[in-house]
């Protein structure tokens, strides 16, 4: 074990003085608050962007199965 002690100390040294940078987080409110209409549009765009492609794949699943077997 005495042979492994110096290499282990070399590997552990950088971990002891590891400094995590401080995040620059602002606690101020937004300059221009988003209206409920903007929030609704943003949410609907997010849902549509995820659901339309998956719906397309699910609706064409049978044709995908047929094309993969031939």
Curated annotation (Swiss-Prot):
Mitochondrial intermembrane face of the membrane: 60-70
GO cellular component: a single term: mitochondrial inner membrane
Mitochondrial matrix side: 25-35
Location, primary (coarse class): mitochondrion
Pathway where this protein functions: Energy metabolism; oxidative phosphorylation
Membrane-spanning segments: 36-59
Transit peptide as recorded in UniProt: 1-24
KW Transit peptide (keyword) present: yes
Compartment(s) of residence: Mitochondrion inner membrane
Superkingdom: Eukaryota
Keywords of the record: Membrane, Mitochondrion, Mitochondrion inner membrane, Transit peptide, Transmembrane, Transmembrane helix
Membrane disposition: Single-pass membrane protein
Pfam families xref list: COX8
GO biological process, one term: mitochondrial electron transport, cytochrome c to oxygen
UniProt xrefs under PANTHER family: CYTOCHROME C OXIDASE POLYPEPTIDE VIII, CYTOCHROME C OXIDASE SUBUNIT 8B, MITOCHONDRIAL
Subunit architecture: Component of the cytochrome c oxidase (complex IV, CIV), a multisubunit enzyme composed of 14 subunits. The complex is composed of a catalytic core of 3 subunits MT-CO1, MT-CO2 and MT-CO3, encoded in the mitochondrial DNA, and 11 supernumerary subunits COX4I, COX5A, COX5B, COX6A, COX6B, COX6C, COX7A, COX7B, COX7C, COX8 and NDUFA4, which are encoded in the nuclear genome.
Its job: Component of the cytochrome c oxidase, the last enzyme in the mitochondrial electron transport chain which drives oxidative phosphorylation. The respiratory chain contains 3 multisubunit complexes succinate dehydrogenase (complex II, CII), ubiquinol-cytochrome c oxidoreductase (cytochrome b-c1 complex, complex III, CIII) and cytochrome c oxidase (complex IV, CIV), that cooperate to transfer electrons derived from NADH and succinate to molecular oxygen, creating an electrochemical gradient over the inner membrane that drives transmembrane transport and the ATP synthase.
Similarity annotation: Belongs to the cytochrome c oxidase VIII family.
The name this protein goes by in its record: Cytochrome c oxidase subunit 8B, mitochondrial
């Amino acid at each position: 074990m005495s042979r492994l002690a110096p290499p282990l100390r070399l590997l552990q040294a950088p971990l002891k003085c590891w400094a995590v940078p401080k995040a620059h987080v602002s606690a101020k409110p937004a300059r221009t608050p988003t209206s409920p209409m903007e929030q609704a549009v943003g949410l609907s765009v997010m849902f549509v962007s995820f659901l339309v492609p998956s719906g397309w794949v699910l609706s064409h699943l049978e044709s995908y199965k047929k094309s993969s077997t031939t």
